[in-house]
């Protein structure tokens, strides 16, 4: 059973930015238990402080690039609950700001390992807990950078490609689990003022100054992003399985 008959969430990448905002909003809801992952829990100071005043928040160690780490994290969760209802993979990196011609193998591989294999590792490790849950929801935080029809003439190379691969993976999983009552979706979180966003804007500013200023002026807070995405996830239905959603709840093309 889920914890005390309530809803159990696993938020992967719950130690900062959007993930931390998800943890905070969810943990303020009655009957919700949240497992928040961090690659290095010892340095996740804000998450640790939050958990001290919210007994329904449990911190787990998880490095998504390692299947062994993902399985260990699932074992940590299983010591507390017998199933989970929502698995939300929010972790990711964006460090690729050069054209394809100049992007190194290391960058291609690191983005694929974290943004694609990472979510796969987590799904494989937590599947047995999800299939016993009530909701059976899997959510992947994706990006509009994955949309082929919406690609801008800027240099997201490895990042955009990895998010497109993530969306393909989401769609494949949605087909595989449909008969078992799962609802699997990807969501674009919006342009969010996180550490990753600030770094990206700094890298792109010299080449695309006008575009960067426009993007920065429209950026929203992690709290706004988390709240809007939760409105989507809180209302997921069977027919939403396999969909890619924008922050406002509209469907996005792949």
Swiss-Prot record:
Subcellular location: Cytoplasm; Nucleus
Residues that, per the record, bind NADP(+): 18, 37, 63, 90, 159, 163, 192, 194
GO cellular component: cytoplasm; cytosol; nucleus
Keyword list, A-Z: Cytoplasm, NADP, Nucleus, Oxidoreductase
One MF term in the entry's GO annotations: oxidoreductase activity
Enzyme Commission number(s) from the entry: 1.-.-.-
GO biological process: cellular detoxification of aldehyde
One Pfam assignment: adh_short
Location, primary (coarse class): cytoplasm
Active site: 159, 163
Family: Belongs to the short-chain dehydrogenases/reductases (SDR) family.
Protein name: Uncharacterized oxidoreductase C24B10.20
Lineage of origin: Eukaryota, Fungi, Dikarya, Ascomycota, Taphrinomycotina
């Amino acid at each position: 059973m889920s914890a005390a008959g309530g809803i159990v969430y696993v938020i992967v990448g719950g130690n900062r930015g959007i993930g931390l905002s998800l943890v905070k909003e969810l943990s303020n809801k009655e009957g919700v238990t949240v497992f928040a992952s961090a690659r290095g829990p010892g340095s996740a100071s804000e998450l640790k402080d939050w958990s001290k005043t919210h007994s329904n928040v449990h911190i787990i160690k998880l490095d998504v690039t390692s299947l062994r780490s993902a399985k260990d994290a699932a074992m940590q969760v299983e010591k507390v609950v017998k199933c989970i209802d929502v698995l939300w993979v929010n972790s990711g990196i964006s460090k690729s700001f050069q054209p394809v011609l100049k992007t190194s193998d290391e960058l291609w591989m690191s983005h694929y390992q974290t943004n694609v294999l990472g979510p796969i590792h987590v799904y494989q490790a937590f599947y047995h807990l999800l299939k016993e849950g009530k909701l059976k929801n899997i959510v992947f935080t994706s990006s509009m950078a994955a949309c082929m029809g919406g690609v801008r003439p800027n240099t997201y190379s490895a990042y955009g490609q990895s998010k497109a691969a993530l969306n393909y993976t989401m769609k494949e999983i949605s087909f595989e689990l449909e008969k078992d009552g799962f609802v699997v979706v990807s969501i674009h979180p919006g342009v969010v003022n996180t550490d990753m966003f600030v770094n990206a804007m700094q890298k792109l500013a010299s080449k695309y100054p006008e575009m960067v200023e426009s993007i920065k002026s429209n950026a929203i807070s992690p709290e706004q992003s988390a709240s809007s995405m939760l409105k989507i996830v809180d209302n997921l239905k069977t027919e939403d399985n396999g969909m890619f959603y924008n922050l406002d709840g509209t469907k996005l093309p792949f």
